[in-house]
C-alpha cells in the first residue's frame, strides 16, 4: 500500500524541478520548460484508451502536455488529462494502446500536441498528431502550432456583420453565411452534402482566394477516402499537395480511439487558425460535430467522471464552447465554419445537438424531397435559416426579395394538397399565377456546380449576389411569367434563363 505523503513532501512536489544545469541567457519561463521537457515516467496502468503514468517527484508534466512512448516501433502520443496525486498522471492515448505494458518508458515533450501548419498542408491528409497519412511523403514544413489555443481576445475580434458570398444562389439569397460565422449542415445520406461542401471549397478559393480545411471527425473511412479522390478529380486538390491545391484534410475516423476523435477537430481548427492569422478568409468544415461530443463522452467515462444528462460528459458545454469560440473573425482574417450535424434518433432536444445549436448563425437543410425532383443543390428554401437575413445587414432590397420568394414558395406548399386532389383547374387565377411563379423559383434555385461538371457535362456557374437578387426580384414581380419553366432549370443568372427560353422556342419552332 502506498505511503501517504507528508506535508513536506507535498510542498516539494508542488515546486518546479530545479534545472540540472544553469541555462545561460534564458528567461525563467524558458528554463522551466527545458526542465520539464525530457522528464521520463513509466506506465503504471492501461485501461483502453486511458493510460496512467508515474513520474519522479518534481517532474510532473502539465495538464494537456503531450507525452511520447514507443509502441511496437510506432510513436504513440498521450495527452495529460488529470493529475492523480502520488506523482501520477492520467492520460488519453491518441492511437491504439494494444501492446503497451506496465513499466514502459514515457517521455514528456514539455508542450501540448503541435501539428504542421501553413500552405504545405494543402492537398495533404494528416492525422490528429499531424502525421501525413496519404502515402505522399513527409510534410515539408517546419512551422508547427499547438492544438490547444485560447479564443481570440475581444479587442482582436471584428464586430462587423458581413456576409460571405458563396456564389450559390439559394444560400446567398435565403440563408446567407456570416463571415466568421458557424453554419449547421443538416441532411441525410445521398442528398448532396459532400458535393455542396466541395463546391463551397471551390467557390471560396475562386472568389476570395481563400483556403479550406476539412476535419473528418469519427465518420466512415470510406467516405473520407471518396472525398479525397473526388477533390482530386474535380480539381480542388492535387495528389501530394502542391500548386493549385485549395484544401487541407485532417482525419480521425470511426476506427480511431476516442482520444483521436475528441482532438481531431482541434487539429483541423489549428490549421485553419494559421491561415486566418495570415490574412485569409478560411472555410472550416467539420463532419461530424456530433462525433466530437460522442468521443468526449467515451473519454469522460474512462477518466472516471460522473456522467450528466443522457450519459454525456459533465463538461459537454465547456468542451463545445472552447472549440466554437475559436471559430471567429479577427481583424486579420476570418474562419467560417460549416458543421455537419447528426441528430441522434431525430431528437433535437438531445444534449449533443442542442449544445451545437446554441453556437450556430445559420442552418442549411438539405431535403430528400427536393433532391427527388432533380433540383440540386437540394437546399430546403423554407427550412434553412440565417440570422444574417436582416435588412440591417443584407439591405432592404435583398431582405424583401428573400421574404417574397419564401412567401410564394409557402403559398405553393399550402396549395399542393388541393392540386393533388382537384387539379390545377380548380384554383383561382391568382393562385394559378402564384403556383406558376413558385415552380419557376424552385427551378431557378437549382444551379450547375463546377465540381459536378465531370458528371453532368454542364459548365459550373458562380453567381454574383447582385445577379441573384435581380433575377429573383424579376421572378416574384412577374417580369418572367411569359417564359417556360424549363428555361429556369440549371442556369446561373436570369440572363441565361432568357437565352435558354429563346433556344427552347427556336427548337420548338
Curated annotation (Swiss-Prot):
Catalytic activity of the protein: ATP + H2O + 4 H(+)(in) = ADP + phosphate + 5 H(+)(out)
Cellular-component GO terms for this entry: plasma membrane; proton-transporting ATP synthase complex
Chain residue ranges for the region called Disordered: 1-28
SUPFAM superfamilies according to UniProt: C-terminal domain of alpha and beta subunits of F1 ATP synthase, N-terminal domain of alpha and beta subunits of F1 ATP synthase, P-loop containing nucleoside triphosphate hydrolases
Taxonomy, superkingdom: Bacteria
Enzyme nomenclature, EC number: 7.1.2.2
Topology in the lipid bilayer: Peripheral membrane protein
GO molecular-function terms, A-Z: ATP binding; ATP hydrolysis activity; proton-transporting ATP synthase activity, rotational mechanism
Keywords: ATP synthesis, ATP-binding, Cell inner membrane, Cell membrane, CF(1), Hydrogen ion transport, Ion transport, Membrane, Nucleotide-binding, Translocase, Transport
Assembly: F-type ATPases have 2 components, CF(1) - the catalytic core - and CF(0) - the membrane proton channel. CF(1) has five subunits: alpha(3), beta(3), gamma(1), delta(1), epsilon(1). CF(0) has three main subunits: a(1), b(2) and c(9-12). The alpha and beta chains form an alternating ring which encloses part of the gamma chain. CF(1) is attached to CF(0) by a central stalk formed by the gamma and epsilon chains, while a peripheral stalk is formed by the delta and b chains.
Family membership noted in the UniProt record: Belongs to the ATPase alpha/beta chains family.
Primary role: Produces ATP from ADP in the presence of a proton gradient across the membrane. The catalytic sites are hosted primarily by the beta subunits.
Name listed for the protein in its UniProt record: ATP synthase subunit beta
Source organism of the structure: Sinorhizobium medicae (strain WSM419)
